[in-house]
């Protein structure tokens, strides 16, 4: 069984959430892989390229996935077409990814992104301002906004999330009995409840 953690947008393998999960897995003697999803080229990041990377890493092997924000959306997309994935843990999954970009940037900034080809964002993993190409948005629109996976899943989402509204996870869980939603008094980062999430999620994954 392979275990993979998929980090969020403009994040990386050294994020606090990724490292908390890795420590918990290490304590159980289990390897948790945490790939750098942009493969060193954040500027040309796309959903399709990240899915291809996951496919290359897993190579059809049985797997269980953890995904945070954009990584949660990736995990859901991948699981929807790969039955060898048999369990998922999603942290504030960024369902309806392209529409969230429209809402966050607003029409003027989105138009400028389209016209110039570039958008500047703060990269939390590198602690710098980085550019990302409009291909990210165009490519995201090609993918299902709410991936219809049927594997057992635990979803953890903060009720005060202003980046990815909890309503997206509520709607998904309401239409997917395989997905159990835990609502938490937290924001998008979920850092104040991270220990409890790890404590609940890891036993579910390694059982």
PLM regions: where:
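Active-site loop/turn elements of alpha/beta-hydrolase fold enzymes
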Residues: 34-40, 93, 186
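The alpha/beta-hydrolase serine catalytic core
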Residues: 85-87, 91-175, 179-207
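Short, surface-exposed alpha-helical segments at coil->helix boundaries
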Residues: 15-22, 48, 166-170
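Short, surface-exposed "cap/lid" segments of acyl-processing enzymes
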Residues: 1-39
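Aromatic pocket-lining residues of Rossmann-like dinucleotide-binding sites
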Residues: 25, 78-82
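Catalytic nucleophile-loop/oxyanion-hole region of alpha/beta-hydrolase
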Residues: 35-58
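Gly/Ala-rich beta-loop-alpha elbow adjacent to hydrolase catalytic centers
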Residues: 66-75
């Amino acid at each position: 069984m392979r275990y993979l953690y998929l980090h969020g947008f403009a994040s990386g393998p050294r994020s606090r959430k990724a490292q908390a999960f890795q420590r918990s897995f290490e304590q159980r003697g289990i390897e948790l892989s945490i790939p750098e999803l942009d493969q060193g080229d954040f500027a040309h990041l796309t959903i399709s390229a990240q899915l291809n990377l996951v496919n290359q890493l897993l190579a059809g092997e049985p797997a269980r996935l953890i995904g945070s924000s954009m990584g949660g959306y990736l995990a859901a997309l991948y699981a929807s077409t790969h039955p060898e994935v048999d369990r998922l843990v999603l942290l504030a999954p960024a369902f309806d990814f392209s529409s969230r970009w429209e809402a966050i940037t607003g029409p003027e900034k989105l138009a400028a992104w389209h016209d110039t080809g570039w958008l500047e964002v703060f990269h939390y993993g590198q602690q710098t301002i980085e550019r990302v190409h409009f291909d990210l948005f165009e490519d995201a629109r090609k993918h299902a906004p709410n991936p219809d996976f049927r594997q057992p899943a635990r979803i953890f989402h903060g009720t005060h999330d202003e980046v990815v509204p909890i309503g997206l996870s509520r709607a998904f869980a309401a239409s997917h009995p395989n997905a159990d939603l835990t609502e938490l008094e937290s924001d998008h980062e979920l850092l104040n409840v991270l220990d409890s999430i790890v404590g609940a999620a890891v036993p579910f994954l390694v059982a």
